[in-house]
């Protein structure tokens, strides 16, 4: 907002095409909070709503039921400085789990969660940055990503399995 003016109030609404009913989600958002992304999951009863506090140092991921309007906090990620925007575009949802980037240990790494919000595994680890999460191949069990593992000046494409076996795919 412009200096001296109040923040806009934001909310999430859904519209049922069959019943022509609009519903407001019961999202416990700070009065001056942001909603930077809303994404569909693989489950029609779970809408992913991503929120940030005003200082942008706390990220919350809620799963909302579009019919009941109930929202459940699945994940909270905090930073002593700020949450980078690439976190929102690197969250991917699968039928039983989701994966996302986080800098909670000081480096950007890939994390794998159950749809209940429980951490299954920190997929990547080390003194390097995962720049982009490219996807997960459910058949082969590989996560694909780009990172600067060899040099902070260049990035390469890698795949890693659930046990941590990593393969560099680019030159």
Segments from the language model and where they lie:
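Beta-propeller folds
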Residues: 1-171
């Amino acid at each position: 907002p412009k200096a001296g003016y109040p923040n806009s109030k934001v909310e999430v609404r859904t519209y049922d095409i069959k019943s022509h009913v609009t519903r407001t989600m019961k999202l416990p958002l700070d009065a001056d909070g942001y909603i930077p992304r809303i994404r569909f999951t693989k489950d029609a009863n779970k809408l992913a709503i991503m929120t940030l506090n005003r200082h942008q140092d706390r990220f919350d991921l809620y799963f909302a039921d579009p019919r009941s309007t109930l929202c459940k906090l699945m994940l909270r990620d905090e930073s002593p400085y700020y949450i980078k925007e690439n976190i929102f575009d690197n969250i991917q949802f699968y039928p039983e789990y989701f994966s996302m980037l986080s800098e909670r240990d000081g480096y950007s790494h890939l994390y794998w969660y159950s749809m209940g919000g429980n951490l299954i595994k920190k997929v990547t680890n080390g003194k390097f940055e995962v720049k982009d999460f490219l996807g997960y191949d459910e058949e082969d069990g590989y996560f694909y990503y780009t990172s600067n593992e060899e040099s902070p000046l260049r990035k390469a494409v890698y795949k890693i399995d659930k046990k941590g076996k990593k393969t560099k795919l680019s030159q």
